[in-house]
């Protein structure tokens, strides 16, 4: 990237960890939440003054989708108001802001994949707060890049979610002998290692504004789970179910697939197909079936 400093907020998360590994040609500060709470504007100001970054990746977020419904103020504080203050700080410091967002900003009612210029229609507190964060980043940090993505999983897992979807499904498969997974939600499951490489490429290309960055192709959560257990060599029934909304829970879009005409116009490399990405991740994590080994 450059020899100039880079700051990554939410530094202990899945994506941040992969960004940190790929940015090995730059000094990187990647404080976790305990070291830097982005809702603490004074702490953010001190960190920017100490690190003096030319590039800031905001990977901090409150992304427990159902909990956001019950903690609306916290959701907007972390995902929107703190982003506005961070964007203002980046503008003052002349640092480029890269802000991560979500496919949940769309309502999922369309049949085709969503393009960058399609109108958002958030259906949950989480989605609404993330959309507000997008607007804040673009309005208050000149040249900011907002990257929408979804279905993330990575080598480092998510502390707030107890690992990642792949490892959780494999654990349940081995413990329960049967899985029930929604078959009516479509998305493009994306390894954070592939996303990190794509985001860095976008920055190097000088991209600003809004881009969609997800794995190529799409599948349902049910199809994704079937691929996981197949690649792991675990013999288990994966039963398809329909989406239900738990009491007090968030509404999830049935179509979470993102198209990327703007990313393509910028000449950015498409991410690998979701199944290719899954196999690469599982191989690196030691999760692929070993020929002749029992499941």
Feature map (PLM): residue ranges:
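Mid/C-terminal beta-alpha module of Rossmann-like enzyme folds, strongest
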Residues: 198, 205-249, 254, 274, ...
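Active-site Tyr-X1-5-Lys
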Residues: 121-145
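Adenosine-cofactor binding site in Rossmann-like domains, unifying the SAM/SAH pocket
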Residues: 24-46
């Amino acid at each position: 990237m450059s020899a100039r400093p880079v700051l990554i907020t939410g530094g202990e998360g899945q994506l941040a960890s992969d960004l940190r590994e790929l940015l090995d040609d730059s000094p990187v500060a990647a404080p976790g939440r305990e070291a830097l709470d982005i809702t603490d504007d004074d702490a953010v100001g001190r960190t920017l003054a100490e690190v003096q970054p030319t590039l800031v990746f905001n990977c901090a977020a409150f992304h427990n989708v159902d909990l956001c419904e019950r903690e609306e103020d916290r959701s907007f504080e972390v995902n929107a108001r703190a982003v506005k203050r961070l964007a203002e700080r980046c503008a003052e410091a002349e640092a480029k802001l890269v802000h991560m967002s979500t496919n949940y900003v769309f309502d999922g009612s369309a049949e085709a994949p969503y393009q960058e210029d399609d109108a958002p229609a958030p259906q949950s507190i989480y989605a609404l707060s993330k959309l507000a964060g997008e607007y804040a980043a673009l309005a208050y940090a000149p040249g900011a890049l907002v990257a929408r993505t979804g279905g993330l999983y990575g080598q480092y897992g998510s502390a707030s979610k107890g690992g990642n979807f792949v490892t959780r499904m494999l654990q349940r498969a081995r413990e329960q002998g049967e899985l029930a997974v929604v078959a009516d939600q479509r998305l493009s499951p994306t390894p954070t290692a592939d996303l990190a490489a794509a985001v860095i490429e976008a920055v190097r290309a000088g991209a600003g504004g809004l881009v969609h960055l997800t794995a190529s192709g799409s599948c349902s959560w049910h199809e994704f789970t079937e691929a996981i257990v197949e690649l792991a060599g675990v013999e288990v029934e994966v039963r398809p179910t329909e989406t239900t909304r738990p009491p007090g829970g968030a509404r999830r879009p049935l179509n979470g697939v993102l198209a990327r005409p703007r990313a393509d116009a910028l000449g950015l490399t498409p991410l690998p197909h979701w199944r290719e990405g899954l196999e690469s991740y599982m191989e690196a994590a030691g999760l692929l079936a070993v020929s002749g080994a029992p499941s």
